[in-house]
């Protein structure tokens, strides 16, 4: 490993700063106890950057990210900035430009049902008896969100709007390669989602994925139409391992997978480019209604650190230790308010961070 592994820390708005404080506890243990050569520098982003510097993504923040090996992101946005035009609000003017600037073409969204949190899932107990551990791999920079032409117009008093789904073979190839590589370290199954019975772009998607799969004979590939996949995820989520999908389909499916865990505050995510530079963040939002109350769940932010260690630093064993610490804490019955089944007995944000940190060091 290089002399220093530099992390740009962007706490942002809402609950971002307080859950990031708990992530710092883990980072400092990795630095002091596991002797990882980490260097963390903090920068403004989102609403706080608008308030202090007049723009959601300041130049010095972008420069700080460019001079780093990874980005650890909190959350951005809140009603405070709703007076701004949509393109200048934190949600649009901070995260999307970061993704574009660093060409973060892939989004990894784990959706895991923890054995001790099955009561949170909206699915029936007989459906989730075996639990599930799904990784959604979503193409992030192509597809209908970015295709041209698009527009909104009017002709002969008839209003209409249109978008264009465009995928190039190289865009599909690189996300498929990543999905298969990730599956090799899991249950060795990839399910690719498409709508190839209707869409030309999906026909190409399926053809390219089939072609790429020949490089990974140890990984089983299956295909599902997106409408059937949505149903199958609800009926039997345990059948899935890695789900590979386009930008639009991934946007939908990753949220569905998150919803059936019943605990969005537990779910991290990673967005990576071809050089393995990544942005790591919780899957949930800024939750301004509970900001500053010390009741937010910090586990998604802590598990984002785990993903950074796993995918950014390629230190699987240490990432596993972070994950195991979270599992151990849950097994012993520790809960924050959002995952507690007892409204009068739960930990504060800082308390949960302390307990996970203690498990990471001492294993108890």
From Swiss-Prot:
Q: Which cofactor does it need?
A: Mg(2+); Mn(2+)
Per the record, the major location class is cytoplasm
The EC number on file is 1.1.1.85
GO CC annotation terms, alphabetical: cytosol
- Where is this protein found? Cytoplasm
Which reaction(s) does the protein catalyse, per the Swiss-Prot or TrEMBL entry? (2R,3S)-3-isopropylmalate + NAD(+) = 4-methyl-2-oxopentanoate + CO2 + NADH
Q: What keywords sit in the KW lines? A: Amino-acid biosynthesis, Branched-chain amino acid biosynthesis, Cytoplasm, Leucine biosynthesis, Magnesium, Manganese, Metal-binding, NAD, Oxidoreductase, Plasmid
The record's GO molecular-function terms, alphabetically, read: 3-isopropylmalate dehydrogenase activity; magnesium ion binding; NAD binding
InterPro entries registered for this protein in UniProt = IsoCit/isopropylmalate_DH_CS (IPR019818), IsoPropMal-DH-like_dom (IPR024084), Isopropylmalate_DH (IPR004429)
Q: How is the cofactor bound?
A: Binds 1 Mg(2+) or Mn(2+) ion per subunit.
Q: How does it assemble?
A: Homodimer.
- Summarize the protein's role: Catalyzes the oxidation of 3-carboxy-2-hydroxy-4-methylpentanoate (3-isopropylmalate) to 3-carboxy-4-methyl-2-oxopentanoate. The product decarboxylates to 4-methyl-2 oxopentanoate.
According to UniProt, the name of this protein is: 3-isopropylmalate dehydrogenase
| Organism for this UniProt entry | Buchnera aphidicola subsp. Uroleucon erigeronensis
Q: Which gene encodes it?
A: leuB
């Amino acid at each position: 490993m290089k002399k220093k592994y530099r992390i740009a820390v962007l706490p942002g708005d809402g609950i971002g700063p307080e859950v990031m404080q708990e992530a710092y506890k883990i980072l400092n243990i990795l630095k002091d106890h596991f002797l990882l050569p980490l260097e963390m520098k903090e920068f403004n982003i989102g609403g706080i950057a608008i308030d202090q510097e007049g723009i959601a993504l300041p130049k010095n923040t972008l420069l700080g990210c460019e001079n780093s090996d990874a980005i650890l992101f909190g959350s951005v946005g809140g009603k405070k900035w709703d007076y701004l035009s949509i393109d200048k609000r934190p949600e649009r003017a901070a995260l999307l430009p970061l993704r574009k600037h660093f060409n973060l073409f892939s989004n990894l969204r784990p959706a895991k049902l923890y054995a001790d949190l099955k009561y949170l899932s909206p699915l029936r107990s007989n459906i989730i008896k075996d639990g599930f551990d799904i990784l959604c791999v979503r193409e992030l920079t192509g597809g209908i969100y970015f295709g041209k032409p698009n527009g909104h117009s009017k002709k002969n008093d008839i209003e209409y709007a249109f978008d264009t789904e465009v995928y190039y073979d190289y865009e599909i190839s690189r996300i498929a390669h990543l999905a298969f590589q990730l599956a090799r370290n899991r249950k060795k199954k990839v399910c690719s989602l498409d709508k190839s019975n209707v869409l030309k772009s999906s026909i190409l998607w399926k053809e390219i994925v089939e072609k790429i799969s020949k490089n990974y004979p140890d990984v089983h590939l299956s295909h599902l139409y997106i409408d059937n996949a949505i149903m199958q995820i609800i009926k039997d989520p345990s059948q899935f391992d890695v789900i590979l999908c386009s930008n639009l389909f991934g946007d939908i499916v990753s949220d569905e997978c998150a919803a059936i865990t019943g605990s969005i505050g537990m779910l991290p995510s990673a967005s990576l480019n071809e050089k393995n530079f990544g942005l790591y963040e919780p899957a949930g939002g800024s939750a301004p209604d509970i900001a500053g109350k010390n009741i937010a769940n910090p586990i998604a932010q802590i598990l984002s650190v785990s993903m950074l260690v796993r995918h950014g630093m390629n230190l699987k064993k240490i990432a596993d230790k972070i994950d195991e610490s979270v599992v151990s804490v849950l097994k012993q019955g520790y809960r924050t308010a959002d995952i507690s089944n007892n409204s009068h007995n739960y930990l504060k944000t800082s308390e949960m961070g302390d307990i996970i940190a203690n498990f990471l060091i001492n294993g108890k």
